[in-house]
Amino acid sequence: MGKKPADRVLADTEAKAFLASIRTSPRKLNLVAESIRGLKADVALNALTFSKRRIAVEVRKVLQSAIANAENNHQLDVDRLYVAEAFVGKAMVMKRWKARARGRVGRIEKPFSNLTVIVRERAEAAGE
């Protein structure tokens, strides 16, 4: 318990998107989040489009939202955006029961996850 940590204040060159209660385990979601960390925004969108993982569709939507936030709310250049941070957190776990042999029950856990994506604008190169 205790006090919740204060939200990190975004820099002027950053934009954020958050999705709560995604119906997958944090471990599975983190595999997809790891794959886009540090990539340019358009390359990351392309990678998620052709990913075979089911949850990549949801991650793609969050990334598109972060890019739209950067463009519309912070007036950042979309061509210079990259995925600065993509991190996963645990959400609730639904517990269900499954009938088993001899009158017993088996516990089924259905985990949920939270996803935060932060995109940042790269500084212009000196030669440009």
Swiss-Prot record:
Q: What is an example of a GO molecular function annotated in this UniProt entry?
A: structural constituent of ribosome
The record's Gene Ontology biological-process terms are: translation
What GO cellular component is one of the record's annotations? cytosolic large ribosomal subunit
- Secreted listed as a keyword: no
Please name one Pfam family that this protein belongs to: Ribosomal_L22
Q: Which domain of life is it from?
A: Bacteria
Q: Write the record's keywords in alphabetical order, separated by commas.
A: Ribonucleoprotein, Ribosomal protein, RNA-binding, rRNA-binding
Q: Does the keyword Repeat apply?
A: no
What exactly does this protein do? Answer: This protein binds specifically to 23S rRNA; its binding is stimulated by other ribosomal proteins, e.g. L4, L17, and L20. It is important during the early stages of 50S assembly. It makes multiple contacts with different domains of the 23S rRNA in the assembled 50S subunit and ribosome.
Q: How does it assemble?
A: Part of the 50S ribosomal subunit.
**UniProt record similarity statement:** Belongs to the universal ribosomal protein uL22 family.
User: Could you identify this protein by its name?
Assistant: Large ribosomal subunit protein uL22
- Source species of the chain: Paramagnetospirillum magneticum (strain ATCC 700264 / AMB-1) (Magnetospirillum magneticum)
Gene transcribed to yield this protein: rplV
